Every structure is written in structure tokens, then in C-alpha cells.
């Protein structure tokens, strides 16, 4: 996709960078594949705020995505590419030879009229889904199953992909994930070939606070601007620095310090992601 930049004729256009979505479908989604969404605005069942900075925004409909891709050896044709407000990558509407429709995550370079299929012995082509044991080493993949048959759970955001590194004789394949982590997966887990679409999503600049509100994001208040009852950094006479290392409202260290329990162990993780400097 192409990035759109604007002349600064208004303050909100200065620095605005958007994705050109002119090639995507401009109509409504397939009605049978959508359902209305009830916004929680960050509240739980008792009405208390459990997730801050949520609320408002445009109404959206959830699109049912086929993460399992379990219809083996049934080819489908890409009818159109669509925008999905609930995720960063684009989605593709697939029509099979029995006139059944489904949505899948659209890989980069997938075009209208292309054919996609799920199977064991099929071509290594963008959009096709295979077990890891049948995918060549070095291939870039996405929508990977953690447990066979449960549907793709990881590597599903815009521009992301994992790389198949090796295969062993114990029924596992090693993948390098987008975070830099090396992890083992069962070799019969399904994965889809290619890098996900909307690669330039990371270069978007929203331009103004109002656009954040359209997306359902509310303002973030600094802890030092609160009262002591609301935040560990709150209170004090006049402006203060907080007086302690940065923490969350629940006193967990922030600013990059690991908070995961050292006692937790996962034998499938070969090497954890390295710290970013």
C-alpha cells in the first residue's frame, strides 16, 4: 500500500500520514459473516473500570475470520480485499466452488482472482495453508497454530511474519517469531505462507487527538498529575517528579523492567526475545 501525506493547510493535517486504501472494497461486508459488537468502554460486569483509556469511538461490526483454514483440498478464489476496523492487517473474502464465503487474513501481494487452498501436498504459494512439516526451511509464514486444530493464534498483525528455522525428529519445528524469540511448534500445526498485508501500518501518524477518540482511545493522564489515592506518583506540594522509579497505578515497575515470574518455565521456548536497547 501507498502512504498518503498532506499539505499542512490545517494544524491537524500537519504531519498526518495515512494508508491509501483506494484499492480495497468500498461497500459493506458480507452480512452473514458479521455480528454487532457491544463496546465495554473498559468496564467489567460490575461497571468498574478495569482497562483505562477506553471508550467512545465509531461503532464497528466484528468480521468472522477463518483462522482454522480446516477445509482441506477445497480451493477458494479471492473475491475482494477489505478493510477490517478490528485489526491492523486487511482481510480477503474467499469463495469456494460450493459458493461458500469466508474471510481470511490477507497476505501481502495477494490479489483479487488468486486461488488459495489448504492441504498437505500443495504448492508453496502466498495464501496457501500447510502443516509446518511440509513447509520448506526459511519460508516466511503467519497465522500459526500453537495447538494443532485450534486455529492460528500468533503472528496475525499487519506486516508481521515468522520464519521457519529448523525441523527435528521429535515432531517439532523451530520458528523465529517477530519478537526475536525462538520457539518450538508441533510439526502438524498449520501455518499460512507469506507476510501479512498493510506493511506500512507502522508508519501511520494519526495527526490529532480527535482521531484517537474516533478509534475509541481516551486521554492518558500522568500519574504525577493525580492525587495520592489514585496513583503512587500522585500528590505533593506543587509540581513533583514522582519521587520514585516509574510504576503503574498498582505499583508494578514500568519503563521496561521485566515483571514475569522467573519460576514460570516453558520447555518449548528455545531462546527468549532479546531486550531492546
Swiss-Prot record:
Annotated segments matching region Disordered: 225-263
Intracellular or extracellular location(s): Mitochondrion
Query: Per its record, what are the GO molecular function terms?
Result: RNA binding; structural constituent of ribosome; transferase activity
An example Gene Ontology cellular component term from the record?
A: mitochondrial large ribosomal subunit
Report which residue ranges the record marks as coiled coil: none
Can you tell which superkingdom this protein's organism belongs to?
Answer: Eukaryota
Cross-referenced InterPro entries: NA-bd_OB-fold, Rib_uL2_dom2, Ribosomal_uL2, Ribosomal_uL2_bac/org-type, Ribosomal_uL2_C, Ribosomal_uL2_CS, Ribosomal_uL2_dom3, Ribosomal_uL2_RNA-bd_dom
Compositionally biased residues, Polar residues = 248-259
GO-annotated biological processes: mitochondrial translation
| Keywords of this entry | Mitochondrion, Ribonucleoprotein, Ribosomal protein
**Does Ribosomal protein show up as a keyword for this record?**
yes
Quote any Pfam family the record assigns.
Ribosomal_L2_C
Q: Which HAMAP family match?
A: Ribosomal_uL2_B (MF_01320_B)
For this chain, the family text in UniProt reads: Belongs to the universal ribosomal protein uL2 family.
Protein's UniProt name: Large ribosomal subunit protein uL2m
Which gene specifies this protein's sequence? RPL2
Amino acid at each position: 500500500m501507498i502512504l498518503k501525506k498532506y499539505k499542512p493547510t490545517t494544524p491537524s493535517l500537519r504531519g498526518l500520514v495515512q494508508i491509501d486504501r483506494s484499492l480495497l472494497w468500498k461497500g459493506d461486508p458480507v452480512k452473514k459473516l458479521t455480528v454487532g459488537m457491544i463496546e465495554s468502554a473498559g468496564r467489567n460486569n460490575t461497571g468498574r473500570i478495569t482497562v483505562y483509556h477506553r471508550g467512545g469511538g465509531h461503532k464497528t461490526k466484528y468480521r468472522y475470520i477463518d483462522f482454522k483454514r480446516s477445509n482441506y483440498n477445497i480451493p477458494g478464489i479471492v473475491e475482494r480485499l477489505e478493510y477490517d476496523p478490528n485489526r491492523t492487517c486487511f482481510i480477503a473474502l474467499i469463495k469456494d466452488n460450493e459458493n461458500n464465503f469466508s474471510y481470511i487474513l490477507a497476505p501481502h501481494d495477494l490479489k483479487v482472482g488468486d486461488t488459495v487452498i489448504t492441504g498437505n501436498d500443495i504448492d508453496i504459494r502466498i495464501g496457501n495453508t500447510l502443516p509446518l512439516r511440509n513447509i520448506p526451511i526459511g519460508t516466511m509464514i503467519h497465522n500459526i497454530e500453537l495447538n494443532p486444530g485450534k486455529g492460528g493464534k500468533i503472528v496475525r498483525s499487519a506486516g508481521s511474519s515468522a520464519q521457519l528455522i529448523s525441523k527435528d525428529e521429535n515432531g517439532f519445528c523451530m520458528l523465529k517469531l517477530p519478537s526475536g524469540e525462538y520457539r518450538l511448534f508441533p510439526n502438524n500445526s498449520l501455518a499460512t505462507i507469506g507476510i501479512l498485508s498493510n506493511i506500512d501500518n507502522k508508519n501511520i501518524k494519526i495527526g490529532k487527538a480527535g482521531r484517537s477518540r474516533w478509534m475509541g482511545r481516551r486521554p492518558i493522564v500522568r500519574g504525577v498529575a493525580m492525587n495520592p489515592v489514585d496513583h503512587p506518583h500522585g500528590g505533593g506540594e506543587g509540581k513533583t517528579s514522582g519521587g520514585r522509579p516509574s510504576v503503574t497505578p498498582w505499583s508494578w515497575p514500568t519503563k521496561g523492567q521485566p515483571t514475569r515470574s522467573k519460576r514460570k518455565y516453558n520447555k518449548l521456548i528455545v531462546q527468549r526475545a532479546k531486550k531492546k536497547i
